[in-house]
């Protein structure tokens, strides 16, 4: 099994974020779960990759050429795949993975998470999508998503596809036990 990690290229302001990324890397390696991620040496993504690799885990980095040229590629990886674009990066990361976890991060992290979650909503895959809610980082997003449901722009069944947990072990158990709901036709002509 391999899990794709979306996370910040920054460590954030609080040490708890990097500590959680490091713990996630250790736990994945110890559970023999491969890590697929954005291929950089910096931020939370670099911390998770370093930890997984230090514990003997499989780590696959996928990075676009323009980021290699900016010298942020993790050159210490055993498997670093260089692609031509961000689109190719996301497609390959998804292809190589059996599920997705987002740690705290910025726009790129959110964009990556929302894209794979949308693919699940549309029935393009049945892989679990999850948030590791470190230090309540995603509390505001969870509240907003509940508001989106209440306002009729997201079905509760699709909201429920997103796993949100505060603890690495609990999160991995939820991912392991995830059963994708049947995707029914969600667009009705009268609503378009």
Predicted regions mapped to residue ranges:
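A cross-family phosphate/adenosyl-ligand binding-site feature
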Residues: 1-96, 134-169, 173, 178-192
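Gly/Ser-rich helix-loop-strand patches that form or flank binding pockets
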Residues: 79, 121-124
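Active-site/ligand-binding-proximal alpha/beta "capping" segment
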Residues: 88-122, 130, 182-187
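Flexible, glycine/proline-enriched loop segments at strand-loop-helix junctions
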Residues: 103-104, 128-132, 159-162
